[in-house]
A protein has these predicted regions:
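Short secondary-structure junctions and interdomain/linker hinges
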Residues: 19-23, 43-48, 110, 133, ...
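Active-site histidine-anchored catalytic micro-motif
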Residues: 1-3
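C-terminal catalytic or substrate-handling cores of phosphate/nucleotide-
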Residues: 5-157
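Non-catalytic all-alpha helical scaffold/repeat segments
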Residues: 146, 160, 165-168, 174
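Hydrophobic, Leu/Ile/Phe/Ala-enriched alpha-helical segments that form helix-helix packing faces
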Residues: 16, 155-159, 188-195
C-alpha cells in the first residue's frame, strides 16, 4: 500500500548517491516518530520559569520549518509565536539525536562520531520502537527528551561562556578551539554513570524548573575539566578519533575515580519513583491511542463497516463480527466504543483485504 511505498522510497533515498547534499535527518523527517514529536512540541508547554507565559520547545522535523512558520505571520501574531516558541528553545532532529544519545543512552563515543552518525543510529532505532511500542511515546518521554536538551546545552553554554581566547582572556582552563564536542557528552556520561544504583535524576524537576540545580552545576564544573584532562591524554592518537572509540568511554567510566557530591546525591530520587511516573504516562498514552483508533473507526461511517461485514462474512469470526456490529452501532449513535472492541476491526480489515 501507500505506507509500503513511502517506506521503500525512503529506504532507496538513504542509499542514494552520497554526492547529493541530503542528510540522514532529511530522510527521517516524515517518519511517524518525528511527526509525533512535532505535534507534541506544539501542545505540551513548559511552565513559565524564564518567561511570563508557558513556552514550547519547537521541534523542527524538517529544515527551516521554524522560519517558514514565521513567514506566514505578521505583527501581533508573529510576536505571540516568538513569545510561545523562543528561538533558544528550537530543537531539530540532529540535535535530538545527539541529546538523546548523550543523556538517555550515555554513549559519548557515538556522539563523538558526529551528528549524521548519531542521527542514523537514533533514527533507525526510534522508528522501529515507535512502530512496536507506541505507548512508550508519551508526555513523560517528551519531557525527558527536553531535559536531555537542557542538560546538554547547559554544559555547552558553560564552556562557551567561560572559554579563554585572545579577544576575551578569561584565564579559564577551556580554550577557544578546544574539544567541546567531545567534552560535553563525556561529561554527561561520567556524571550519570556515577549515580548510585537505585537512584536517578529527578526528570520532573528539571522539566518543571527548565534548568539545572546549583548542585548539578557544581558537578559539571568538576567533571568538564576532568574530562578534558582525560581525553587530551590520548596516547598519541588524534583526540577526536580517540573519543570515537567505545573502549575510550569504557576506560573513562571504569578507571577514572569520581564520586558525585553529597548535595548532588541528595537531589536524586528513587528509580522506582520515576518508573511509576513513566508507567502511568504509558497507561494514559495507551488510552489516548485506543481512543484515537476508535474515533478513526467511527469516522469511516456505518456504511463502510456494513459493506465490510457483507463482503467478508465468510472470513470473519463471530468475535470480529460482534466487534464490527458494535462499531456500526457506535458510528450511528456517535458514542465511543471500548478500547477492547475498538482494536478488532483493524485486524478484520487486514483479513478481508487479503482475501
Amino acid at each position: 500500500g501507500v505506507r509500503f511505498y513511502d517506506e521503500m522510497v525512503q529506504a532507496i533515498a538513504r542509499y542514494a548517491n552520497s554526492q547529493n547534499k541530503v542528510t540522514a535527518a532529511d530522510l527521517f523527517s516524515n517518519e511517524p516518530f518525528h511527526i509525533w514529536m512535532e505535534k507534541m512540541s506544539k501542545k505540551h508547554l513548559a511552565a513559565p520559569k524564564h518567561y511570563t507565559i508557558p513556552t514550547g520547545w519547537y521541534y523542527e522535523r524538517s529544515r527551516k520549518r521554524y522560519q517558514q512558520e514565521q513567514l506566514k505571520l505578521r505583527g501581533d501574531e508573529l510576536k505571540r509565536f516568538l513569545a510561545k516558541f523562543p528561538k533558544k528553545q528550537l530543537i531539530n532532529k540532529e540535535q535530538l539525536a545527539i541529546y538523546y544519545t548523550a543523556v538517555i543512552k550515555c554513549e559519548p563515543h557515538i556522539v563523538s562520531k558526529g551528528k549524521n552518525w548519531a542521527m542514523k543510529e537514533f533514527g533507525t532505532a526510534i522508528s522501529e520502537e515507535f512502530r512496536t511500542k507506541k505507548e512508550t511515546f508519551n508526555e513523560f518521554y517528551f519531557e525527558r527528551c527536553i531535559c536531555a536538551a537542557i542538560i546538554f546545552r547547559t554544559i555547552d553554554d558553560y564552556l562557551e561562556r567561560n572559554k579563554d581566547s585572545a579577544r576575551n582572556q578569561t584565564g579559564f582552563w577551556y580554550k577557544v578551539g578546544g574539544y567541546k564536542l567531545n567534552i560535553v557528552p563525556y561529561t554527561i556520561a561520567k556524571i550519570l554513570s556515577a549515580i548510585p544504583k537505585g537512584c536517578t535524576l529527578n526528570w520532573k524537576k528539571i522539566w518543571d524548573q527548565q534548568m539545572l540545580s546549583s548542585a548539578f552545576m557544581h558537578e559539571i564544573e568538576i567533571v568538564t575539566r576532568m574530562t578534558n584532562d582525560f581525553i587530551c591524554d590520548s596516547h598519541g592518537m588524534i583526540v577526536t578519533e580517540y573519543c570515537k572509540r567505545q573502549s575510550t568511554w569504557e576506560t573513562y567510566c571504569t578507571t577514572v575515580p569520581y564520586e558525585p557530591s553529597h548535595s548532588f546525591i541528595e537531589e536524586l530520587v528513587p528509580e522506582s519513583m520515576m518508573k511509576e511516573i513513566e508507567n502511568d504516562a504509558k497507561k494514559d498514552q495507551k488510552e489516548i491511542n485506543d481512543l484515537q483508533t476508535a474515533i478513526d473507526m467511527i469516522t469511516k461511517g456505518a456504511a463502510y463497516w456494513n459493506a465490510l461485514l457483507t463482503k467478508g462474512s465468510s472470513l470473519i469470526s463471530f468475535q470480529e463480527q460482534a466487534a464490527i456490529t458494535q462499531i456500526i452501532n457506535m458510528a450511528t449513535t456517535g458514542n465511543i466504543p471500548s478500547s477492547r472492541s475498538g482494536k478488532l476491526p483493524s485486524k478484520t480489515v487486514s483479513i478481508v483485504k487479503a482475501a
